[in-house]
C-alpha cells in the first residue's frame, strides 16, 4: 500500500442509472431470467443424467457447459438483483475480489469447454470410425478437468496481480458487478501490467480458442458436405449449427469486450454488452440445444410422458 493513502474496504456498484420504478421492473425481469437460467440448465443436467442414451462424450461436455452457465450466473446475478433493490448497499473488498475471481474462472472455463466441444464434434464427424477409440472416457474427463483447472489458474493470475494494488478512492464502481477492468480503474497505483495481462489473456485464450473452434468447424462443414445420406447430413448439421450459435454468442460478445481497443466502443455500451454475456448467454444456451437437438427433445418428451402415465 502506498504512503499515507487510506485503502478503501468496500465498493459501491453504480449499476444502472435509472429511476426506482424502472429498477423494480428490471428486478422482476432479471429475476425471471435468473430462474430460466437455473431451470433451463438444470433441466439439461437432469435429462443427461437420467437418460443413458445421452451418456456420450458430447452430452458429457454439454453437462459441464450447463454447470458453468449456472455457476457464472450465480456469481453475478444475485449481486445485480441486490443492487436493484438496494442501490446504496456497498459490497466489501473481499466480496468484490471473490466475485471477480469466480466470474473470470467460469468465463475462462466456458471458453475452453467450447473448444473441447468443437474438437469432439470434429472427431465425431470427420473421423467417425475412430471416434470411440479417440474420445474415450479417460480423454473426456481429462479434457473437462483441464478446462476447469486452466480456467481457475488464469483467473488466479489476474487476482494475484490485482491484490497488491492500493485502492484509495473513489469507491464508486461504474458497473453492475465487480468486473476486472472497472475495478482496475479505481486503483491508485500503476495498472499497466494488469491491463496488459488482461489483453494478453483475452488474445491468447479468446482469440486462440475462437480460431481453434473455427478451424474445427471448417473441417466439419467440409465433411458434412461430403455425407451421402440426407438424414445423416441433416443430423450432423443440426447438432453443429446449435454449437455454432452458442460459440458465436459467447466469443462475439467476449472479443468485443476485451480484445477490441477501449476507444472503439463507449464504456456504457460494453457494460450492457457484458450484461448480455453474463445474463442472456446462460439462458439461451439450453434453449438453443433443446430446440435444435432432436435427442434432447426426445428425452424430454419421454420423461414427460413417463410422468403422466405414472
UniProtKB/Swiss-Prot annotation:
It is found in: Cell membrane. Gene3D superfamilies: Rhodopsin 7-helix transmembrane proteins. InterPro entries: GPCR_Rhodpsn, GPCR_Rhodpsn_7TM, Olfact_rcpt. Belongs to the G-protein coupled receptor 1 family. Its main location: membrane. Odorant receptor. GO terms for molecular function: G protein-coupled receptor activity; odorant binding; olfactory receptor activity. The chain crosses the membrane at residues 25-48, 57-78, 100-119, 139-157, 196-218, 236-258, 272-291. This is Olfactory receptor 2A25. It is a multi-pass membrane protein. It comes from the Eukaryota. Residues 49-56, 120-138, 219-235, 292-310 are cytoplasmic. Residues 1-24, 79-99, 158-195, 259-271 are extracellular. The keyword Transmembrane helix applies. Disulfide bonds join 96-188. GO terms for cellular component: membrane; plasma membrane. Keywords: Cell membrane, Disulfide bond, G-protein coupled receptor, Glycoprotein, Membrane, Olfaction, Receptor, Sensory transduction, Transducer, Transmembrane, Transmembrane helix. The keyword NADP does not apply. CDD domains: 7tmA_OR2A-like (cd15420).
Amino acid at each position: 500500500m502506498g504512503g499515507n493513502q487510506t485503502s478503501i474496504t468496500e465498493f459501491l456498484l453504480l449499476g444502472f442509472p435509472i429511476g426506482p420504478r424502472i429498477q423494480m421492473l428490471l428486478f422482476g425481469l432479471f429475476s425471471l431470467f435468473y430462474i430460466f437460467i437455473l431451470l433451463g440448465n438444470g433441466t439439461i443436467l437432469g435429462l443427461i443424467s437420467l437418460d443413458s442414451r445421452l451418456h456420450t462424450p458430447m452430452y458429457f461436455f454439454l453437462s459441464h457447459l450447463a454447470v458453468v452457465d449456472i455457476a457464472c450466473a450465480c456469481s453475478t446475478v444475485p449481486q445485480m438483483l441486490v443492487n436493484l433493490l438496494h442501490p446504496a448497499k456497498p459490497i466489501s473488498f473481499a466480496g468484490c475480489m471473490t466475485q471477480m475471481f469466480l466470474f473470470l474462472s467460469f468465463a475462462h472455463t466456458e471458453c475452453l469447454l467450447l473448444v473441447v466441444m468443437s474438437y469432439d464434434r470434429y472427431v465425431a464427424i470427420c473421423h467417425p470410425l475412430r471416434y470411440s477409440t479417440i474420445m474415450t472416457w479417460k480423454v473426456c474427463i481429462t479434457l473437462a478437468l483441464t478446462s476447469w483447472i486452466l480456467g481457475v489458474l488464469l483467473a488466479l493470475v489476474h487476482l494475484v496481480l490485482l491484490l497488491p494494488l492500493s485502492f484509495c478512492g473513489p469507491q464508486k464502481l461504474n458497473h453492475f458487478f465487480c468486473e476486472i477492468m472497472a475495478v482496475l480503474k479505481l486503483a491508485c497505483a500503476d495498472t499497466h501490467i494488469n491491463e496488459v495481462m488482461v489483453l494478453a489473456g483475452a488474445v491468447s485464450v479468446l482469440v486462440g480458442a475462437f480460431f481453434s473452434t473455427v478451424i474445427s468447424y471448417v473441417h466439419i462443414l467440409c465433411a458434412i458436405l461430403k455425407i451421402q445420406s440426407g438424414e445423416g447430413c441433416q443430423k450432423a448439421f443440426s447438432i453443429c449449427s446449435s454449437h455454432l450459435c452458442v460459440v458465436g454468442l459467447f466469443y462475439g460478445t467476449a472479443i468485443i469486450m476485451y480484445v477490441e481497443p477501449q476507444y472503439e466502443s463507449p464504456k456504457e455500451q460494453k457494460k450492457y454488452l457484458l450484461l448480455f454475456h453474463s445474463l442472456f448467454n446462460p439462458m439461451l444456451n439450453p434453449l438453443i440445444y433443446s430446440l435444435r437437438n432432436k435427442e434432447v427433445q426426445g428425452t424430454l418428451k419421454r420423461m414427460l410422458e413417463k410422468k403422466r402415465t405414472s
